[in-house]
Amino acid sequence: MKTNLLNITFLNFKSKLTLLISFGLLLLTLISCNKKAEETPAAEAKPAETTETAQVAPANPPANFKHATATVNGIKIHYVIGGQGDPLVLVHGFGQNWYMWNRLLPELSKHFTVIAPDLRGVGESDKPESGYDKKTMASDIHELVNQLGYKSINLAGHDIGLMVAYAYAAQYGDSVKKVALMDALLPGIEPVWSSVKASAWWFGFFGWPASGDIVKGKEKEFLTNFWPVVGHVKDPFTAEESAEFIRAYATEGGTTDAFKWFGAFDQDGKDNVIFAKKKLKMPLLAMGGEYFAAAFLKDHSKLVAENVSESKIAGSGHWLVQENTAQVQKDLLAFFLAK
């Protein structure tokens, strides 16, 4: 890896000052919400306007998809499934749920049977006390795939989902045809990991055991302040997407347990160092946003895989699917359909 990549901050489009300001705004928002609650007389107190009052039911996928659940590793995993052809499993990341893929489902389902789960810890999936290391979370997905009767799959993961997808491919490589890693990086894989960890303040905050309790009940304020920090396009989500993502994290335990994905990074790093001793052999697409992970993801992926190709999503920050839907769809289809 080139020397100049060692100093990439993972947010080279944002200065450290901008990150600190964003963090400060987040904390001020939380403090303001707490203060207003304390100052409101009991007789005038009103129920908070949460997504659970505004949107009780989960969002629906396209008409040719359905909601379903499966019990895997002793917990319930929710997923949507639809389409025809070979299976393609799509794994979401933090700040979103299965619905992050909704724009892509109509076209992808013309070519694949698409399965998009909610990871353990968020949305309609269970939220157990433990099991948030990516090795275990990958096992959840593998058990789901087995229950559905598939012997091999195509696989894509974004953000935390990238980490889960890698852990899946590393453990069950013989059953993965192709894998797309989208706009994040792998804990423990150096030299990039240490540089990113030092500059991405949310890694520490989210991994702090009390963080979920701080954000609980303020999911809308939290997410709407966080999304722009790692994005590039202004307001990339539709109102429906924002409402669904907020609702998914406002479910009981949603933020508390999703933050455990970050709390498991130390264990993930240990697991990844072991996984990386045997490089992935299946084709791997490193897909990064022009203003986010594209700066390093291809070289980073080559540390763990032998057959790496690249997709740089033009004009995009971290939220690839929403910031440049057309190119993401085009490049994923080109990769997964190529013989």
Would you name each region that the model predicts?
Residues 14-16, 35-36, 120, 134, ...:
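Basic side chains
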Residues 1-2, 267:
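Short regulatory "switch" loops immediately downstream of catalytic or recognition motifs
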